[in-house]
Amino acid sequence: VRLALATAALILAGCSTDSFVGPLAYTRSERLAIDLRTEEGQPKSRLQARVNQVMDEVFGDAPNHMKVPPGSGLRDGGAWLAANAVLPSKERPGRVFYERAGTEGTTDLVFIQGGYGLYRLHCLHCHGLSGDGMGPTAPYLWPRPRDYRRGVFKFTSTNSMKPSRDDLRRIITHGVHGTSMPAFESLMSKSDIEQVIEYVIFLAARGETELALVNEAMSADDADADTTVTNELGLQLAQTVFENWKLADT
């Protein structure tokens, strides 16, 4: 697969159709409020704020304004996450297309709707905007939808807690018997499913990085927030998380 639009240093802008209206904000981890407290039980507000700021810097401040950390291993640098890619040399997002295998050099290009848009359409109502398993339908389901943010998945064929892309492809395509996870084979094309896979990996890596930042900040003094929770630390933790995802596909 080769993109018709270069995707280095991507910032991604999501779709803006009527299907995706409403406020767009990631749900912050409950660990921010629970773990980042003093011995007296007072919130470490500066550390909490720094974790949020670093997450915004590394992954983007909203689902429709994503940043893809370098070295993520996501397809084509993350261009499959959203319908439009904002390049450093451009002021406006450009539509992203890819070439079907075997059609290189032709004009037979497929528009990437984007894993973000497809996720909002098909998955958000159960798995939530942040992948926390707290979508509006979730309270009525048992077992509850998976919380991607922990980076732990049950149905895997790998030796690690991370599923391979084949695992995710199988689950999304065929569903999971005995759970509320339906089969999407008749609702999404193969291309759509591939884009959702990339977005699920992005959400899971984002959530796991957030938890890792909280763990780093737990023992720090609130006054040291700026030197303890840095953008460099956030990027380093994100790259470590993405490396574990890459291993699942080896």
Across the structure, where does each feature detected by a protein language model lie?
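Electrostatic cytochrome c docking/interface patches
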Residues: 35-118, 213-250
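Extracytoplasmic electron-transfer domains, predominantly the class I c-type cytochrome c fold
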Residues: 19, 26-53, 57-58, 139-201
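Short, solvent-exposed loop/turn and secondary-structure capping segments
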Residues: 128-140, 158-160, 181-184, 207-215
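Domain-length accessory/inserted modules outside core catalytic folds
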Residues: 200-203, 210
